[in-house]
Amino acid sequence: MNESLFLALMDPAGAPAHPLVFLVLGVVTFALHMTAVNVMLGTLGLAAVGSFSSNPYWQRLSGALGTTAKAAVAVAIVLGVAPLLFVQVIYDPFWYTSNVISAWWLLGFLAVLTVAYLALYRWYGLNHSYADDGTPSSRPGAPRGGFWLAGSLLLMIVCGAIMHAVVNQSLQPAEWMNWYAPGGTIVPYGRELHSLTIGRLAFFLLLSLPVTAAWLFGMRRYLLSSDETDYGYVDFIEGLAHAMAKAGAVLVLAAGALWMAALPENMEWFRTSVWMWIALVPIAYFGAMSFIQKKRKLCIFCNYMAFGMTIIMTIVLAAVREVLRFVTLLDAAGWNALDYKITMDWPSTAIFFVTFLVLGGLNLSYLLTLAWKSGQTKDLYTPSSGLTRVGTLAIASHICWVAGYFIIGWIVING
């Protein structure tokens, strides 16, 4: 490969902060994005199964998890923007070239995701009614429209396959000319996906099993804390969580082995590196999660911490994934992301962290606390004065941010 060509494609404006900042933020935000994706896939799959079941516990779980999946899609989309932007900053020629090679599929991704989301909302509409004030309530009886859930799940998996292929293509610059001009004939249509690795795709999709199992362990404890009286339903959720945790660990390990066996030549170094062994730590935790929850069944903190631990383990996997990309592109194209030119932009850096920490912190704290408290109240929930103040501050932070956005823009334009 002509390494000087790739170095010439670096953005002459440089990165607005040290590249290490983007690498770390990329890992963390990708892990959070994948956690939301895995919750979405797992709850959507369980909701689809429950919608076709005659078991009343499955039917009840279908209604609850279908609503969870709907929210998880929104969270996954929001959290997916940040890692995408970080990749574009420090791996720009690789990401953009891969996008162009499969341009039709990238554009199709947006359409497929939209249809999948609409299908999920169609199911939600079939199973909920609305009061005059707009308050939704679940319709009685068995869930309706299970085919909408199944269709949504299938389309979400298609979205995952598209993004998987595009990322894979970006790591194989030596193949770009073969894909763009096979046999010397230029094919500029972007209608093909050129690099589908079943093991890699399955690995990230199957992570939804242990992650959703951890979600169910927390859900079980949440129901008990909310004075749930149907203990048969609680036991049903617990049994399902244990089964998913055990099966998920085995399947993720098998998919990982398949992925390692199918690594292309420029990534084979990873098999004998210490990073592969580090990647086994999260899988080992997933395998032990069921045992830990059985031993700590009465530990409230432990039940909730199962999901927190899956986030930490996903961050570990995301870090190992980033090492694979970093070293592969360093060897294949001489691309060292840490050598990226730095043109320090303190205002944009400050705006990012203020947005992420202040706006994100206030709004998430308010929404999560509100959801938590209201879910544990059988009657109409009235927020405390302290929580109401947090909500007021959250709204005020949004107003200030939007106003600041336009004020800064006006100042820059009018210099």
Kindly label every feature range from the protein language model:
Residues 43-68, 85-96, 123-141, 214-243, ...:
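Juxtamembrane membrane-water interface segments of multi-pass membrane proteins
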Residues 70-79, 148-170, 247-252, 302-321, ...:
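Hydrophobic alpha-helical membrane-insertion segments
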Residues 131-281:
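Long, contiguous internal "core" modules enriched in hydrophobic/ aromatic residues
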Residues 1-73:
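N-terminal signal-anchor module of multipass membrane proteins
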Residues 1-3, 173-190, 325-344:
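Membrane-interfacial helical/loop segments at transmembrane boundaries in membrane proteins
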Residues 20-34, 97-110, 184-205, 271-276, ...:
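Short aromatic-rich membrane-water interface segments that cap or initiate transmembrane helices
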Residues 72-151, 253-287, 408-409:
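Membrane-interface helix-loop-helix modules in multi-pass inner-membrane proteins
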Residues 3, 326, 403-415:
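Juxtamembrane boundary at the C-terminal end of a transmembrane helix
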